[in-house]
Amino acid sequence: MSTRKAQHGARQDTEYGARQGTEQGARRSAQRGALGRYGESLAARRLTESGMTVLERNWRGGRTGEIDIVARDGDALVVCEVKTRRAGLFEHPMAAITPAKAERLRGLAERWVQEHGGAPPGGVRIDLVGILLPDRGAPVVEHVRGVA
């Protein structure tokens, strides 16, 4: 990669170097997207196996964000956040629900309910499905109900 000297002797990437970095970033982004879709498929399967009905996946609430899975559990509506991680690289997926994230999910759930005819008799619950992908072996799927 070619570089040139900037003021104060620091190295600065030229156009080729910046483009190369962008291509690497795009590849990583595509890999993260594929990982997320795989995790969401595993989560939807787990929810279905536990008796829930998946109503929607990847519902977008305008610019405020996205609900990974909207499901029905009896007479309750479930807004489900899915976090998928490779083992050892990042924090555990269950650490993903911060107070700010919980508040955003509550707002998205409220918007979904408004757009779909009101709250069901069983209310609305926010769940988390955390998926840990080990280097070898089967994925570990954890479902925690009522996280926020």
From Swiss-Prot:
Residues 1-35 are annotated as: Disordered. Belongs to the UPF0102 family. It comes from the Bacteria. SUPFAM superfamilies: Restriction endonuclease-like. Pfam families: UPF0102. GO terms for molecular function: nucleic acid binding. This is UPF0102 protein SAV_2633/SAV2633.
